[in-house]
Regions:
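C-terminal motif of bacterial Sec signal peptides marking the signal peptidase cleavage site
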Residues: 10-13
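Gram-negative bacterial Sec-dependent N-terminal signal peptides
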Residues: 2-8
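N-terminal export leaders
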Residues: 1-2, 404
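Bacterial signal peptide processing site
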Residues: 15-17
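Ser/Thr/Asn(+Pro)-rich, low-complexity disordered segments
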Residues: 23-443
């Protein structure tokens, strides 16, 4: 079992995932050096279960992925998410690499989705609606054309373009990407909008501070058609700031904020003039573990189980509905924010596997071993559970299952990074945004 971590040792343990500053991203997460055979076997099983979600919830005709599904596989959910479908596309590429499906099957599954999205699904200047009917592609009521969800779909499409270069997938994926009017989505200023609705126009919110939007901005800056100016990358605030063990980091409490962009873009070996985004995600993860342990001391009856063994807060289901919970918060007072009630969300450490390996894999293995099939089943981990009350979500959510799949694979091989970063959009984005390769050359 992975040893418990605390204090400065926790910081160095996060760096272990990099292993050697002189190797590639793929080598930086290779299982032969970074993880034990037992941990690799655990991740292999977790990955395969996670991918099963994207196999079984894909509509047979459209390939669109259900936004959520019963953890026991008994559901028939009609709503697809475009972000969910983007994770599914990346999952198809991983499945081929791992030998779960053939290359022909991976190409066929990806082509089905991409052709349907290109030819059948309504869009506004290239931007799709966040939630659509899984079988028809029609917009779900009141669903916006969400920019971040579009980015998560497109980055999945571009990953398949590099995974299957000898097929027609690259041409289809690039058609979808190139018709997106990124400049229009600025609405005349330096910040991309959250989205657009036909009933009201642009949503009354912009991407102006540190959040999960880095993948969105970089795709917009790196676009071949209708890109936004590189100055837009510099315009947003790298804050607000918190401090953990003497290091400042830009924060937002739910951990998915620090994981989605990092699953695709290589922030380990490339840095800009503003911030070390990889280190920032490590600090955010470790600060959350520390905060949850202090919550356990302050609220032992409700949260006494929070520990190195049981931690993880990110947006998820809760007993009373969907919650955007996380930790820590800007206010220095130690208290449970946003209704935090002792719930543990496995996708929080799941999405941090490649960022902070040891504490993340430790809690996931503990959760599987301690609670068994109550929390670990057909699609991997249930979306959330509360060890104190015994509540367990009946559902798995596609985006949470997806980030766990991607980061488990990045931990083992670096495959998602190395595949996506070959795409010209990724290369252009880093060049235009001023990222420099800090990787030392091989000797």
């Amino acid at each position: 079992m992975v040893p418990l971590l605390a204090g400065v040792s926790g910081l160095s343990s996060c760096k272990k995932v990099e292993k050697n500053e002189e190797v590639t991203v793929a080598q930086a997460s290779a299982s032969s050096d970074a993880i034990s055979a037992e941990d690799d076997a655990f991740l292999a099983d977790l990955e395969r279960r996670c991918y099963r979600y994207f196999e079984e919830t894909a509509d047979p005709d459209t390939g669109l992925i259900a936004d959520r599904w019963k953890a026991d596989g008994s559901d028939t959910w009609d709503t697809a998410g475009i972000a969910a479908t983007g994770f599914g596309l990346t999952g198809h590429a991983i499945a081929v690499k791992r030998g779960w499906i053939t290359e022909d099957e991976g190409i066929a599954r990806s082509r089905k989705v991409l052709l349907f999205m290109r030819d059948k699904v309504e869009h506004k200047r290239g931007f799709y609606y966040q939630f659509i009917n899984r079988s028809t592609g029609e917009r779900e009521p009141n669903s916006p054309a969400s920019t971040i969800d579009n980015a998560l779909f497109v980055v999945g499409a571009l990953t398949t373009a590099e995974a299957f270069p000898d097929s027609d997938i690259p041409a289809i994926a690039n058609e979808i990407y190139n018709r997106m009017d990124w400049a229009w989505m600025l609405d005349g200023n330096d910040f991309l909008q959250y989205g657009w609705k036909p009933e009201e126009g642009f949503l009354k919110a912009e991407w102006k501070t540190y959040c999960e939007h880095m993948v969105l901005l970089l795709l917009a800056v790196g676009a071949e058609k209708n890109p936004i100016p590189p100055a837009c990358w510099d315009a947003w605030e790298r804050g607000p700031l918190l401090e953990f063990q003497g290091e400042k980091f830009a924060h937002y409490p739910p951990l998915f904020i620090h994981q989605y962009s990092q699953a695709y873009f290589d922030f380990q070996n490339y840095k800009d003039k503003h911030l070390d985004y990889w280190r920032n995600s490590q600090l955010a993860t470790l600060a959350q573990i520390d905060y949850m342990k202090r919550l356990a001391e302050a609220y032992p009856d409700q949260m006494g189980h929070y520990s190195d063994d049981l931690w993880g807060l990110t947006a998820s289901d809760g007993p009373d509905g969907y919650k955007d919970w996380g930790a820590p918060y800007k206010d220095p007072r130690l208290r449970p924010w946003r209704g935090v009630d002792g719930t543990v969300v496995p996708s929080a450490p799941g999405g941090s596997l490649a960022i902070c390996l040891e504490p993340s894999i430790h809690t996931l293995r503990v959760q599987k071993e301690r609670f068994g099939d109550k929390v670990y089943g057909r699609y991997g981990f249930a979306n959330a559970h509360n060890p104190r009350t015994g509540w367990v979500s009946q559902y798995c959510l596609a985006i949470d299952t997806g980030i766990t799949l991607l980061m488990a694979e990045n931990t083992r091989s670096g495959y998602v990074w190395n595949t996506f970063m070959k795409h010209p959009a990724a290369v252009r984005a880093f060049e235009r945004a001023g990222f420099k390769n800090i990787q030392k050359p091989n000797k």
